[in-house]
């Protein structure tokens, strides 16, 4: 192998690795943007996270389309005094223009004056199928799995 071939191979490898790192960061960013959007009840921001025809299992049943997904989020979170969703332990696997993503979440829900206590914590995992679009990465499907809860479940019963 000549020096120019080795240099070209290295350049190609570095470009591929850079693309992978950028893609993985963009997919991880979706989870954070989702948290910010739902905690602020920011529909415009929410629309930059999911595909219009996305699906999601956020509890019982499957929500079909971004309108149903938003309606479910709004139903649960809009009555609250506040909520704070945190994500971590991300694992991203990119395959061309599709990816899988999983992470853990910790969600604090607060409703001041709720009988039985004003806080409810839900912790679990998000597992996503994600697609690259002209506008960037978007979630095609999300599965939410609850691993544990603490506090007053009446806070988030809607």
Language-model-derived ranges and their functions:
Residues 1-36, 40, 48:
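Short, low-complexity N-terminal intrinsically disordered segments enriched in polar/charged residues
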Residues 9, 13, 84-89, 108, ...:
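C-terminal-biased regions
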Residues 25, 80-83, 119-121:
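Transmembrane beta-barrel outer-membrane domains
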Residues 43-107:
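A solvent-exposed, acidic/Ser-Thr-rich amphipathic alpha-helical stretch
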Residues 85-87, 121-126:
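Short, surface-exposed coil-to-beta transition loops
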Residues 107-111, 130:
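Beta-strand elements of well-folded, non-transmembrane domains
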Residues 113-120, 155-157:
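Short, surface-exposed loop/helix-turn segments at secondary-structure junctions
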């Amino acid at each position: 192998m000549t020096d120019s071939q080795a240099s070209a191979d290295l350049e190609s490898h570095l470009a591929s690795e850079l693309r992978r790192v950028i893609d993985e960061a963009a997919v991880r960013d979706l989870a954070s943007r989702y948290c910010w959007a739902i905690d602020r009840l920011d529909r415009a921001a929410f629309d930059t996270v999911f595909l219009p025809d996305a699906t999601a299992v956020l509890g019982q049943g499957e929500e079909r389309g971004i309108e149903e997904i938003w309606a479910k989020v709004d139903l649960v979170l809009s009555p609250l005094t506040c909520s704070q969703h945190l994500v971590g332990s991300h694992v991203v696997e990119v395959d061309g223009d599709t990816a899988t993503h999983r992470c853990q979440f910790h969600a604090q829900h607060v409703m001041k004056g709720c009988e039985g206590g004003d806080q409810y914590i839900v912790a679990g995992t998000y597992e996503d199928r994600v697609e690259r679009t002209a506008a960037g990465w978007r979630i095609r499907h999300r599965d939410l799995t609850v691993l544990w809860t603490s506090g007053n479940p009446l806070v988030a019963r809607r």
